[in-house]
């Protein structure tokens, strides 16, 4: 009996040492517990789909949404915990990473209700759609906490593969297939460019893959001022540029937006930018800390091109989704200002604040587009003429979201841009902020042009699509309109709650 007790104690002590050595969640506070919730949700989806019939479809939506909400709650419960590095340095947990994870989870939580009625009307496979959304979300969450080059490469590939599959989900649609091919080819090329830049960092640092160790390695090898660092910086910037889709890396964006299912576009338009912004802040701020002047210059050029080209080309668009694609290119130019400012002068805090508002504004706009598309079957901007006469609630919701995207006071977009531009001005980015102000005013023009069409009540200018417009059933008000109402409220009245939002964003800085 004594031997058994000693043997049990030896096994227990050995297990504890083994777990502690590898920083497994059981003994270190469960760093990846939010990610494990999503993995458990994925397993449940597969089990239910393989063992049940069509009557359990609502359970699939319920499990997906519940797992996302529970992951958000898990992140909030461990807020302000000490930063931790786990899995032999591959994964880092801190408030700054977690706030990006919360934003990604929030995007996915709002996007699932947007897809319910759309999937039913188009007869798309439901389980696979939800699996791809949750897996892409999981990849984005791992990307936010990635602390070495291998994880930084694998995590966005997990997100990208699911994005490719989602963009081509309507296999019988020629435009969707074309968009998927362009997305896949350019995504593969950008991943190759990104990993080539990583190989330069790996070699110049003396074989290091952890971000902080790369900095130490560059100092030890005295390669931080070598031409190789500039080459690595250029390749990595181009690779990340595809994920952020600033000009001139934006060619895939309009085609993918136009050809993909609208709920997929809504999902990709926000989650990809949040995940890529998290990646950009870590890559540029840590390994390239000693080359800040060089990457500042590169990002300033990208921001200028994005703001100018995105807003100018958006004026000429006739498709609502293509217009939002070019609008998003301009919006990423504003977000890049926060990345350039960085930790000083509240640059990251202003970027996070504006990104939160951008999620609500953009998803609210897409919710309105999905509703209008399901009821009329069109995406043409001119076909929105006279919508206010048929559905005042939808027209007003779309108008508020568009005005908020344009940055008109007193809506959320105005306060977000004001804070972001002010931080850029304090950091000395005077020319960049002036261009941002001019292009913001320019964007108001094409937003107001759409709003003018919405409010047009003359019968001779109302299109047949609006003339035959039909209101949806009560069920849609529990799904698409639920997300729309939440996003519209978040896009219009957060001005009174700006201080708490900014305080949370500042508290997340590392």
Swiss-Prot record:
One cellular-component annotation, GO: chloroplast thylakoid membrane
Where do the coiled-coil regions begin and end?
none
Enzyme Commission code(s) on record: 7.1.1.-
What catalytic activity does the UniProt entry give for this protein?
A: a plastoquinone + NADH + (n+1) H(+)(in) = a plastoquinol + NAD(+) + n H(+)(out); a plastoquinone + NADPH + (n+1) H(+)(in) = a plastoquinol + NADP(+) + n H(+)(out)
Keyword Plastid annotated: yes
Which chain regions cross the lipid bilayer? 26-46, 57-77, 99-119, 124-144, 149-169, 184-204, 227-247, 295-315, 323-343, 354-374, 395-415, 418-438, 484-504
Q: Where in the cell is it found?
A: Plastid, Chloroplast thylakoid membrane
For biological process, the GO terms are:
ATP synthesis coupled electron transport; photosynthesis, light reaction
Membrane topology term reads: Multi-pass membrane protein
Q: Does the keyword Plastid apply?
A: yes
Superkingdom classification of source: Eukaryota
- Keywords, ordered alphabetically: Chloroplast, Membrane, NAD, NADP, Plastid, Plastoquinone, Quinone, Thylakoid, Translocase, Transmembrane, Transmembrane helix, Transport
Q: Which InterPro entries match?
A: NADH-Q_OxRdtase_suN/2, ND/Mrp_TM, Ndh2_N
Which molecular-function annotations from GO does this UniProt entry contain? Answer: NADH dehydrogenase (ubiquinone) activity; quinone binding
Q: What class of enzyme is it?
A: translocase
Q: Which family does it belong to?
A: Belongs to the complex I subunit 2 family.
Reported function: NDH shuttles electrons from NAD(P)H:plastoquinone, via FMN and iron-sulfur (Fe-S) centers, to quinones in the photosynthetic chain and possibly in a chloroplast respiratory chain. The immediate electron acceptor for the enzyme in this species is believed to be plastoquinone. Couples the redox reaction to proton translocation, and thus conserves the redox energy in a proton gradient.
Q: Which PANTHER family match?
A: NADH DEHYDROGENASE
Subunit comment: NDH is composed of at least 16 different subunits, 5 of which are encoded in the nucleus.
Q: What is this protein called?
A: NAD(P)H-quinone oxidoreductase subunit 2, chloroplastic
């Amino acid at each position: 009996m004594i031997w058994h007790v000693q043997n049990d104690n030896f096994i227990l002590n050995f297990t504890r040492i083994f777990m502690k050595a590898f920083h497994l969640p059981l003994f270190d506070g469960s760093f990846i517990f939010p990610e494990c919730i999503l993995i458990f949700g994925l397993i449940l989806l597969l089990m239910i789909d393989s063992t049940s019939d069509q009557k359990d479809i609502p359970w699939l939506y319920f499990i997906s949404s519940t797992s996302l909400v529970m992951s958000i709650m898990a992140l909030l419960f461990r807020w302000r915990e000490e930063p931790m590095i786990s899995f032999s340095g591959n994964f880092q947990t801190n408030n700054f990473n977690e706030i990006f994870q919360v934003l990604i989870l929030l995007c996915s939580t709002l996007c699932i209700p947007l897809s319910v009625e759309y999937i039913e009307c188009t007869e798309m496979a439901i389980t696979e759609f939800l699996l791809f959304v949750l897996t892409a979300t999981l990849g984005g969450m791992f990307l936010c906490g990635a602390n070495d080059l291998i994880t930084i490469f694998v995590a966005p590939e997990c997100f990208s593969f699911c994005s490719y599959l989602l963009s081509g989900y309507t296999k019988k649609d020629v435009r969707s297939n074309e968009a998927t091919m362009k997305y896949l080819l350019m995504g593969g090329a950008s991943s190759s460019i990104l990993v080539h830049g990583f190989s330069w960092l790996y070699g110049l640092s003396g074989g290091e893959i952890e971000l902080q160790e790369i900095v130490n390695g560059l100092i030890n090898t005295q390669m931080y001022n070598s031409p190789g660092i500039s080459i690595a910086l250029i390749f990595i910037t181009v690779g990340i540029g595809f994920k952020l889709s600033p000009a001139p890396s934006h060619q895939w964006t309009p085609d993918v937006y136009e050809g993909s299912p609208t709920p997929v576009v809504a999902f990709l338009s926000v989650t990809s930018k949040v995940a890529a912004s998290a990646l950009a802040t870590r890559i540029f701020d840590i390994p390239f800390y000693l080359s800040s002047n060089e990457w500042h210059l590169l990002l300033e050029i990208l921001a200028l091109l994005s703001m100018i080209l995105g807003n100018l080309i958006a004026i000429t668009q006739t498709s609502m989704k293509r217009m939002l694609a070019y609008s998003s290119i301009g919006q990423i130019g504003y977000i890049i200002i926060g990345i350039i400012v960085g930790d000083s002068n509240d640059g990251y805090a202003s970027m996070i604040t504006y990104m939160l508002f951008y999620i609500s504004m953009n998803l609210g706009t897409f919710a309105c587009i999905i509703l209008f598309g399901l009821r009329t079957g069109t995406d043409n901007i001119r076909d929105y003429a006279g919508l206010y006469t048929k559905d005042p609630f939808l027209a007003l919701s779309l108008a508020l979201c568009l005005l908020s995207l344009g940055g008109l006071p007193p809506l959320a977009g105005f306060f977000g841009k004001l804070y972001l531009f002010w931080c850029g001005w304090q950091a000395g980015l005077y020319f960049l902020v002036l261009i941002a102000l001019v292009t913001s005013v320019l964007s108001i023009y094409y937003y107001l042009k759409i709003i003018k069409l919405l409010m047009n009540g003359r019968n001779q200018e109302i299109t047949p699509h609006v003339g035959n417009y039909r209101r949806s059933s009560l069920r849609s008000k529990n799904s698409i309109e639920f997300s729309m109402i939440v996003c519209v409220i978040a896009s219009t009245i957060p001005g009174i709650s700006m201080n708490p939002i900014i305080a949370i964003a500042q508290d997340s800085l590392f």
